[in-house]
Amino acid sequence: MLQICCKNNNISKNFPIGSSLLDIYNGFNLDIPYGPVSAKVNNKVEGLNYRAYNNKDVEFLNILNPSGMRTYVRSLCFILCKAVEDLYPDGKIMLEHPVSKGYYCALQIGRETGLDDVSRIKQRMKEIVEANIPFHRFECHTTEVVELFRRKGMMDKVRLLETSGELYSYYYTLEDTIDYYYGSLLPSTGYIRKFDIVKYYDGLLLRVPNRQNPEILEEVVKQEKMLEVFKEHRRWNQILGVGTVGDFNVACNEGYATDLINVSEALQEKKISNIADKIYHRGKNGQRVKLVLISGPSSSGKTTFSKRLSIQLMANGLKPYPISLDNYFVDREKTPKDEKGDYDYESLYALDLEFFNKQLQDLLHGKEVELPRFNFTTGRREFKGDKLKIDDNMILILEGIHALNPELTPHIPAENKYKIYVSALTTILLDNHNYIPTTDNRLLRRIIRDYKYRGYSAEETIRRWPSVRAGEEKWIFPYQENADAMFNSALLFELAIMKDYAIPILRNVPNNKPEYSEAYRLRKFLEYFASVQDKELPPTSLLREFLGGSSFRY
C-alpha cells in the first residue's frame, strides 16, 4: 500500500501501489466542480491516468486552474485534429496562436475554407466527444517515435523530437490517430463539456470555456489588428524556413543562428522605422502628431521600444521628449484600494487625471509647465524646477499601461495622438499542433529581469504573476485594438537565448513550493530549444532590456 495526502481536503489515505489518479480521486469521494481534469503530484502536473507507486502529495485541478485549462485545451485540440484527419485525409490543420479569447487555426485542404467545412468539422468533433473515446499515452525509444511520425508525414514532429536530445519520447493516440502534445491530456473525450468552432477570417477559431465561469464560452473579441500582426510574423517565419521549434533547432545545428539573429533584429528595426515614418508623414498631411502613446503588458519591452522609436523619430527631424506617468500618481492616501484592501497602483484612478490632462493641454498650446516628480518614499508629488515648453518639432512620448485607455487623454484631439500597442507575440510554434503561449515568453523575460535587477527569486515572480495578469486583463487588453500601430517585440530566437539564463533560476524553486509546478513546466518547455549564446545580440536589442548589456539607460 502507499499513502496519498490529498491537498484538496488535507486528508491522507492508503491506496494499492499503482493506483491511478482517477482511482485516488474516487477513493477520496471528492466532488470538485468543473473537474478533475488533471492533478499536481508532488507539485508536478500529471494526467488523471498517471499511476502512483510511492507515497505522494496530490492536488486535483479543475479547469478554473490555468494548468487544468491547458489540459482541457490540449485535449480539445487533439479532438479537432482527429476530426480534420477523419474528414480530410490529405488535409492539414495548424493550431497557430491564441487570439480573440480562443485559438486561431489554419485549415489547409487545397481550397478556401467554407462554412460547410466548419459545420462538418464541428459535427465530427461532437461525435468524437459523445463517443467518450480514451486518450492513450505511449512511451518508446525516441527513434521509434520519430519513425512513427515520419511514416505519417508529420515532419514538424520528426524535427522536434530528433533535435530534443531525449533517449525516450512519448506520443498519444485517439483511436487510430496519433499525435504529440506538450503536457497531459484528459482521460477520454467525454470529459469535454463545452466548445465551439467557427469561421474566423480565412481560418477557424476554436472557442473554449470562460476561465471564470466554465458554464459559458469565452466571448469572441474582435482582434483584427492582433491577428494581422501574428500572420505577418508567421509569413516571415515561413520565408526564413523556421515555422516551428524543430525547424529552428535544425537551422541552429547547421550554423545559421547568427543569421537568424541578424535578420530578426533587422526586421524589428525596419518595423520601428516604418512607425516613425508614419508619425512624421501624418504631420506632413496637416494632422501633426504631438503625443505618442505607448502601451503594452508587463515585460513586453515598451521601454526599449520607446527609446528605439525616439531614435527613428530624431532621424526624421523630430525631437522626442519622454513623459513618465509615474510622476502623476495621486498622493498615496488617495490611491484606490483593491479587493484585498491594498493600494492598487495599477488602477487608472491611481493617477491624477485632471492635473495630468491640464499639463498636457498647456504643453500642446505652447505654454511652459513645471513637471512634477513623484517621491515614492513620501508618497507625494514634488516640484523641483523641471520646466518644459515644446516647440514645433518636439513630440511627447508617453509610455505606460494606461496609454491607450481613452480616459487617460480625453481632452487631447485624436489627430494629435498616435497610439502604439507593444507586446511579445510568440509566432514560432512548438510544432503544428502545439502553439507557444505568449504569456510564457513575457513571464520568462520577467523572471530573468526580476532576478537580475530587482533581487526577486523565480518563486516570487511566479507567485505574483496571476495578479499581474489580472491587471492586464482589466486595464490593458481591452484597449489594444485602439492602437494606430501594433509592434511585436518577440524575437524568433529569444527563447533559445533565454534558455541558459532562465533554467538555472527556475531550478532554484524548491519542489515543496506551489510555484514549483510552473517553474518545472517552464524548464521542460525551454529544453525543447537548442541553446543560442547572446554574444551576437546587438546592444540595442529589445531582449537586452531583460538580459543586460544594453546601450540604453533604464
How would you label these PLM feature ranges?
Residues 292-294:
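Hydrophobic anchor at the beta1->P-loop junction of P-loop NTPases
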Residues 302:
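Conserved lysine of the Walker
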Residues 9-19:
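Short, contiguous acidic and Ser/Thr-rich linear segments
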Residues 305, 309:
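Hydrophobic positions on the alpha1 helix immediately C-terminal to the Walker A/P-loop
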Residues 50-53, 57-69, 83, 92-270, ...:
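Auxiliary tRNA-acceptor-end handling modules of aminoacyl-tRNA synthetases
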Residues 334-377:
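Conserved nucleotide-sensing/catalytic segment adjacent to the nucleotide-binding pocket
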Residues 315-333:
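Short beta-strand-centered segment that lines the nucleotide-binding/catalytic pocket of NTP-utilizing
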Residues 283, 410-554:
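Conserved NTP phosphate-binding and transfer environment spanning the P-loop NTPase/kinase superfamily
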